[in-house]
From Swiss-Prot:
Protein keywords: Acetylcholine receptor inhibiting toxin, Disulfide bond, Ion channel impairing toxin, Neurotoxin, Postsynaptic neurotoxin, Secreted, Signal, Toxin
Job of this protein: This three-finger toxin binds and inhibits the nicotinic acetylcholine receptor (nAChR).
Record's signal peptide: 1-21
Site, Key residue for inhibition of muscle alpha-1-beta-1-delta-epsilon (CHRNA1-CHRNB1-CHRND-CHRNE) and important for inhibition of neuronal alpha-3-beta-2/CHRNA3-CHRNB2 nAChR: residue positions: M46
CC terms in the record's Gene Ontology section: extracellular region
Disulfide bonds, paired cysteine numbers: C24-C40, C33-C58, C62-C70, C71-C76
Domain of life from the UniProt record: Eukaryota
Sequence similarity: Belongs to the three-finger toxin family. Short-chain subfamily.
Annotated positions for site Important residue for inhibition of muscle alpha-1-beta-1-delta-epsilon (CHRNA1-CHRNB1-CHRND-CHRNE) and neuronal alpha-3-beta-2/CHRNA3-CHRNB2 nAChR: H28, R43, H51, R66
Organs and tissues of expression: Expressed by the venom gland.
Record-given protein name: Short neurotoxin OH-46
Length: 78
């Protein structure tokens, strides 16, 4: 009985997802987010007139800007 209980405990510990982190797209490749970063974002901004820049990656909160979208699942900001 102790062996069965010990086996169950080991399987439970191994199967737990300890320290899940979000994965977001960047302009070039993927980014593993920090544990506190709960969202992926894609945002278009204009640093110079008539030159839009696409920003993608992890973020701590969802921006409320007009040309910004955020989501909270892996690779959702493609």
């Amino acid at each position: 009985m102790k062996n069965l209980l010990l086996t169950f405990l080991v399987v439970t510990i191994v199967c737990l997802d300890l320290g899940y982190t979000l994965i977001c797209h960047q302009v070039h490749g993927l980014q593993t987010c920090e544990p506190a970063q709960k969202f992926c974002q894609i945002r278009t901004t204009m640093f110079f007139p008539n030159h839009p820049v696409l920003l993608m990656g992890c973020t701590y909160n969802c921006p409320t800007e007009r040309y910004s979208v955020c989501c909270s699942t892996d690779k959702c900001n493609k």
